[in-house]
Amino acid sequence: MANPRQRRKARSGSTLKPSLNAKKQMKKKLARAPTIHGADVLKDNYDPKLTLRQNYARLGLVPSLDVRPNTGGTERAPSSISASSSKEGQAAVRKGMARVIRDDAGNIVDIIEADEHDQDETAWGKPLPSSIADRSDVPTFMPVSQPASNPDALQQLEQIASQAAPVERHTSQKESQWLVELVKKHDDDTQAMAKDRHLNLWQKTEGEIKRAIRKAGGFQALRTSA
């Protein structure tokens, strides 16, 4: 049984433990889907009950993700795995050795010997194996392209992407005033500006000062505004 002091603490809210309502709000935040930041088209067509990859697949954007096998990508079918392994097993024949192929009864059906061209050795050793780019059985692990369930949303996203433009950066009033003082004192000597202990309080490098002056319009614009 709690004493009166503990009861007063619980009523006054001075305790450090979260209340029952606070615990409910914390559970709601954990179960709540993350906020989607982006275009309105993406927000309207995003299903919070699906995963991110499932939403991209529903919008027809999966092939643009360049999925890798260890990051939730699609795996190869067992037939392709066995076919590639059998090809690799048939291609590997050691020098001076041969592979004997028998039937179910144990009779010799065929003998596969190493190719003379593969047995040739150069003066610096055995030749390197063929490049992986020359092989036709190299898996890409890319998912199969799926049609978009909402082609209008995909067209709107493509239209937004085609109208993208670089963001113009502007110099703030305080930074412009600081650059005017630097140019008034050192003219165009950016090296002296970087070494000035009184004006260069933030220890900006020479390159950072040059970029700031270029963004503000150049030396001439700063001289005229002085």
Curated annotation (Swiss-Prot):
Renumbered residue ranges of the record's region Disordered: 1-23, 65-90, 118-151
Domain of life: Eukaryota
Species the sequence originates in: Mycosarcoma maydis (Corn smut fungus)
Assigned GO CC terms: nucleolus; ribonucleoprotein complex
Subcellular location field: Nucleus, Nucleolus
Keyword check for rRNA processing: yes
Family named by the database record: Belongs to the NOP16 family.
Keyword Ribonucleoprotein: yes
Biased composition (Basic residues): 1-11
Task of the protein: Involved in the biogenesis of the 60S ribosomal subunit.
Keywords, in A-Z order: Nucleus, Ribonucleoprotein, Ribosome biogenesis, rRNA processing
Gene Ontology terms describing biological process: ribosomal large subunit biogenesis; rRNA processing
PANTHER family: HSPC111 PROTEIN-RELATED (PTHR13243), NUCLEOLAR PROTEIN 16 (PTHR13243:SF1)
Xref: InterPro entries: Ribosome_biogenesis_Nop16
Name by which UniProt lists this protein: Nucleolar protein 16
Subunit structure: Component of the pre-66S ribosomal particle.
